[in-house]
């Protein structure tokens, strides 16, 4: 999973986010060389793109689910589609 271009087509949001956390820990450890830090930074940049794509896709799906009975999106006062927040239950 070290090459983000290999992950891009199939990487889930959670997988990409987990790898981003690993990279952050490694870079914050102070034990990596400058060259390795640059490679990790490049990988993190690609993973952020993957995460953004997955989040944008999810937002579009939510907008579809929030359509009113006539098939139109329910719009707020700002003329933007109303989307609903999902609350994730705590696992602790």
Swiss-Prot record:
Protein location: Cytoplasm
GO terms assigned for molecular function: exodeoxyribonuclease VII activity
Name of one Pfam family that matches: Exonuc_VII_S
EC class (word): hydrolase
Statement: the UniProt record of this protein carries the keyword Hydrolase: yes
Catalysed conversion reaction: Exonucleolytic cleavage in either 5'- to 3'- or 3'- to 5'-direction to yield nucleoside 5'-phosphates
Any one Gene Ontology BP term: DNA catabolic process
Taxonomic superkingdom: Bacteria
EC number annotated for this UniProt entry: 3.1.11.6
Main localisation: cytoplasm
Keywords, in A-Z order: Cytoplasm, Exonuclease, Hydrolase, Nuclease
GO annotations of cellular component type: cytosol; exodeoxyribonuclease VII complex
Subunit text: Heterooligomer composed of large and small subunits.
Similarity remark: Belongs to the XseB family.
Purpose of the protein: Bidirectionally degrades single-stranded DNA into large acid-insoluble oligonucleotides, which are then degraded further into small acid-soluble oligonucleotides.
Protein name per the record: Exodeoxyribonuclease 7 small subunit
Species: Protochlamydia amoebophila (strain UWE25)
Lineage, uppermost ranks: Bacteria, Pseudomonadati, Chlamydiota, Chlamydiia, Parachlamydiales
Encoding gene per record: xseB
